[in-house]
Amino acid sequence: MAAEQRRSTIFDIVSKCIVQSVLRDISINSEYIESKAKQLCYCPASKKESVINGIYNCCESNIEIMDKEQLLKILDNLRCHSAHVCNATDFWRLYNSLKRFTHTTAFFNTCKPTILATLNTLITLILSNKLLYAAEMVEYLENQLDSSNKSMSQELAELLEMKYALINLVQYRILPMIIGEPIIVAGFSGKEPISDYSAEVERLMELPVKTDIVNTTYDFLARKGIDTSNNIAEYIAGLKIEEIEKVEKYLPEVISTIANSNIIKNKKSIFPANINDKQIMECSRMLDTSEKYSKGYKTDGAVTSPLTGNNTITTFIPISASDMQKFTILEYLYIMRVMANNVKKKNEGKNNGGVVMHINSPFKVINLPKC
């Protein structure tokens, strides 16, 4: 019986985002392609060709182009993906050929079979390149973090280093991009421009963890009309670096925010008139859950978005033309890979010629000098 292929939750999310961004302007049910894409992580070399051919066959069977205007719209979306194709010559040959077919309507209609074959090949080229790049980076990240050949102290240090490195990535790179603010440079004042990408990432990791960017982002989202009252995810993820106060202190305020109503100012009731018992219990449950996470009673690591349903990739923060949905996800995966490599180098044990001593601690061993 063949061994079951390892799956990656991270890659399942990333691959779906990649597929939907590439097929954004194409009328096709992408579920089959998404299921095929997920197979490319931890995929043996002998199986990759079959998976990629399955993606092409699905495109060939389902993609239809009605007119040259539709083709031009599709090409406008595909152009930005050229940066993630290993052989740019292949990309531009296919892309420019498709552009030529839009010269006249008669030429377009006559050559439609050739156009479809060319477009299907271009889409498969982009998808397979981006998915394989993403799979390689996700595999590196997961293997680095899940490696069993580490002492407990090294594993703890690396997990914490990576956690706060990712928090800084969100605070200094992703959130400023979403709200349209200038991205803060990770280097220190007076330094020469950084030529080493690893050094740039290292400085990003050294920037202060506590910033105002989360509150600034909430203000931005509130101006866009998005409900920002439920911020449990920020506490769990470590983005909102604040102590959670007692439930009783903030329950009326939270309920008032959700209801968008003034609190009745009398001694008999501290709740808005249009809040029922069910809503009060829901708010209480949410805050109780936050408190449990903050005290470590719940350690499942689950994080859900406070802004959307978070059921599918399409329920991300609903900002139109978001770069994250278009093509930059691979750049951020690469930054995460460099971060993981930097964390590994920082915490790798060096042979100091000492003696390993076993102790009755969860960390099990310490190194002592030879005496």
Swiss-Prot record:
One of its GO terms (cellular component) is virion component. It is found in: Host cytoplasm; Virion. InterPro entries: Poxvirus_G7. Induction: Expressed in the late phase of the viral replicative cycle. Phosphorylated on serines by F10 kinase, phosphorylation state is regulated by H1 phosphatase. The keyword Phosphoprotein applies. This is Assembly protein G7. It comes from Vaccinia virus (strain Western Reserve) (VACV).
